[in-house]
Amino acid sequence: MIILSGQPVTNEQLASFQLEGQKRIILMQLQASNDTFRYRQASDLLFEVTLRSNIMNAARDLNKSGASFAIFQRSRANDAFWRVSEAGALELRYQVEPSRGIKDIFENGSQYAFECATAIVIVFYMGVLQTVGDEKFNRRLRSLTLYDWHYDTLSIYTERGNDFIYGDCLYFENPEFSYQQSQWRGENVIYLGEDQYYGHGLGILTAAEIIDKLNKRRRPGAVQSAYLLPQTTRMDVIYLRQMFGS
């Protein structure tokens, strides 16, 4: 449910936004959700809708970029823009504009390899970049480390629930993963709607297809199937609005 300026949003207000395509679907999903989404003003709501749409687009683009999957210890990147730490994090080089560094991953993906958690962070950053523009992005994010949630500056949080909305990050758990392939203990994905999920290293697949791939990477004698966890990982939109002054 959407609460706008302290009041439940009306159908007339929703219609006044005149959104189309996936943006309209996102708006209606927010309204139909059992979760409550509170906004001070209409521009905050439109910011979230646009951000989620851009996250979906970024996930599709990263899938086509040629970037490879790798465990953290084997991460690699375009050396002109990024330094790879011993832990496998991508650290933006001094005097490289953050927007340029993020865009290079999508433009020269074949030079990059990283874990699925890193891929989600990259998708989130690109979604924000496309939403706020280069100037604001570079002004507020003067240095970047791409690794997992612990290194983000976007106020990423995870909460329980299965009321999924386009652009959410979800997680497929593989409880009996092979110890020889511990990277397949699970898969972080971006929800693209209509049973489509982007998972780095797997591609854009249905839930059944992702579960099948994870099940093939279980340890011998495993009996428990992989499954989609009832949780969502999102960015704090109000925090982002304050951060970028949009």
UniProtKB/Swiss-Prot annotation:
GO molecular function, one term: protein-glutamine gamma-glutamyltransferase activity
Enzyme Commission number, as recorded: 2.3.2.13
InterPro entries registered for this protein in UniProt: Gln_gamma-glutamylTfrase_bac
Catalytic activities: L-glutaminyl-[protein] + L-lysyl-[protein] = [protein]-L-lysyl-N(6)-5-L-glutamyl-[protein] + NH4(+)
Biological processes annotated in GO: sporulation resulting in formation of a cellular spore
UniProt keyword terms in alphabetical order: Acyltransferase, Sporulation, Transferase
Origin superkingdom: Bacteria
Enzyme class: transferase
HAMAP family, per the entry: Tgl
Family from the record: Belongs to the bacillus TGase family.
Family annotation (NCBIfam families): PRK03187.1 (NF002869)
Protein function: Probably plays a role in the assembly of the spore coat proteins by catalyzing epsilon-(gamma-glutamyl)lysine cross-links.
This protein's name: Protein-glutamine gamma-glutamyltransferase
Species name: Bacillus pumilus (strain SAFR-032)
Lineage summary: Bacteria, Bacillati, Bacillota, Bacilli, Bacillales
Gene behind this protein: tgl
